């Protein structure tokens, strides 16, 4: 018995020694690997590298902004709770930019202040592009408290975290809905803000918070008030894919494509009694590629202690009926159109004067052909009938 035990003990010791040796070797190999560091590259500032936090980066506009930032060699962290965004869009971006230190995704809700502060404490951000928001006018009239919480309160949470962790640049995604229904057109940045729906009111409150804070801060602030967004990535990599339950609140382009694909029986145009030439609303439709370009130019031009406020639009108003005809032409589909009563909270006419952003940021909308923008978006929709689920 003693003899047997004495033979087993060295064997056990030997195995233990080998295991320790292998563990040490693995640690050495990992430490020598270029992808292994004791702290993430996202947690430290690097000379020549600008790290941008993109809130809502899994959404339609945020994902397109992330694509442009990555293409321009920015480091990007996306924070999104995926309530309106798509993980599929994030995966597309991850496949396009797989290199370490380029892109990270963090699942979090901006309504959770502890989570937001943890994110800021663990990452070295140089700037924030704040897109995350619920953004449907009709829905805002049905769920106003949700909009004030999601837009106004969450913006305050982000701003407080930026102040606490010394993040000095904010590019804020605002909206022409803050103007309401002005007496004169086109809308300039000096046009009085009198929003008429909870979406516009919540955005204006968020703007006011940012502006009040900026008065006693060296933060560089850019507020972009943009108009009706259409189009998609010309390279066909990203598109708009709202959740099925949100389609009734979505953009007119999405409804038009759904009708062309046969997902819905036809297109519903709400309101034909507006005081416009053909009775339908007039809007300024801005291509998402141009919109993203405005954000990047704003980031580049942002100055410490300064606030820039800009309208982002084409400067041309198009009626809903004009839009529908352009959509029919782009899709080649025979789309049934039903005319219904007005949607609560909508306004008759709104289009921009983009002179200020042209003069100060050297930005001009380039994708101004309505049919071409819709054709680009239609190609993505046809290739992805189930959104990113068919990617």
UniProtKB/Swiss-Prot annotation:
Membrane topology: Single-pass type II membrane protein
Keywords of this entry: Carbohydrate metabolism, Golgi apparatus, Isomerase, Membrane, NAD, Signal-anchor, Transmembrane, Transmembrane helix
Side of membrane Lumenal, spans: 31-391
Classification via Pfam families: Epimerase (PF01370)
Needed co-factor(s): NAD(+)
Gene Ontology molecular functions: UDP-arabinose 4-epimerase activity; UDP-glucose 4-epimerase activity
Subcellular location: Golgi apparatus, Golgi stack membrane
TM regions (residue ranges): 10-30
Keyword Plastid: no
GO biological process: capsule polysaccharide biosynthetic process; galactose metabolic process; UDP-L-arabinose biosynthetic process
Pathway entry: Nucleotide-sugar biosynthesis; UDP-L-arabinose biosynthesis; UDP-L-arabinose from UDP-alpha-D-xylose: step 1/1; Cell wall biogenesis; cell wall polysaccharide biosynthesis
GO CC terms of this entry: Golgi cisterna membrane
Residue positions binding NAD(+): 51-82
Family named by the database record: Belongs to the NAD(P)-dependent epimerase/dehydratase family.
PANTHER family: UDP-ARABINOSE 4-EPIMERASE 1, UDP-GLUCOSE 4-EPIMERASE
Protein name: Probable UDP-arabinose 4-epimerase 2
Gene: UEL-2
């Amino acid at each position: 018995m003693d003899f047997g035990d004495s033979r087993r003990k060295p064997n056990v010791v030997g195995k233990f020694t080998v295991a320790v040796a292998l563990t040490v070797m693995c640690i050495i190999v990992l430490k020598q690997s270029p992808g292994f560091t004791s702290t993430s590259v996202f947690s430290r500032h690097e000379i020549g590298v600008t790290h941008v936090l993109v809130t809502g980066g899994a959404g339609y506009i945020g994902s397109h902004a992330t694509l442009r930032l990555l293409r321009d060699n920015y480091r990007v962290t996306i924070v999104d709770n995926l309530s309106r965004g798509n993980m599929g869009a994030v995966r597309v971006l991850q496949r396009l930019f797989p290199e370490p230190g380029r892109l990270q995704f963090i699942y979090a809700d901006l309504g959770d202040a502890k989570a937001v502060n943890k994110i800021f404490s663990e990452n070295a951000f140089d700037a924030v592009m704040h897109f995350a928001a619920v953004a449907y006018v009709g829905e805002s009239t049905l769920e106003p408290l949700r909009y004030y919480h999601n837009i106004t309160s969450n913006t305050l949470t982000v701003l407080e975290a930026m102040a606490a962790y010394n993040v000095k640049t904010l590019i804020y995604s605002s909206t022409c809905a803050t103007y309401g229904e002005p007496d004169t057109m086109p809308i300039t940045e000096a046009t009085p803000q009198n929003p008429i729906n909870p979406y516009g009111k919540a955005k204006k409150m968020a703007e006011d918070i940012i502006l009040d804070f900026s008065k006693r801060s060296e933060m560089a602030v850019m507020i972009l008030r943009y108009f009706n967004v259409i189009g998609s990535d010309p390279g066909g990599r990203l598109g708009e894919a709202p959740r099925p339950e949100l389609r009734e609140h979505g953009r007119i382009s999405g409804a038009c494509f759904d009708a062309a694909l046969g997902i819905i029986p036809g297109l519903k145009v709400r309101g034909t009694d507006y005081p416009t030439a053909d009775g339908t609303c007039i809007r300024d439709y801005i291509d998402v590629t141009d919109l993203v370009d405005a954000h990047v130019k704003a980031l580049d031009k942002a100055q410490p202690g300064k606030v820039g406020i800009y309208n982002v639009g084409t400067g041309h108003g198009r009626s809903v009926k004009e839009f529908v005809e352009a959509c029919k032409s782009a899709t080649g589909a025979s789309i049934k159109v039903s005319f219904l009563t007005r949607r609560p909270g909508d306004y008759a006419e709104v289009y921009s004067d983009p002179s200020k952003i042209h003069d100060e940021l050297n930005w001009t909308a380039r994708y101004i052909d309505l049919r071409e923008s819709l054709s680009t978006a239609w190609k993505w929709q046809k290739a992805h009938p189930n959104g990113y689920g068919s990617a």
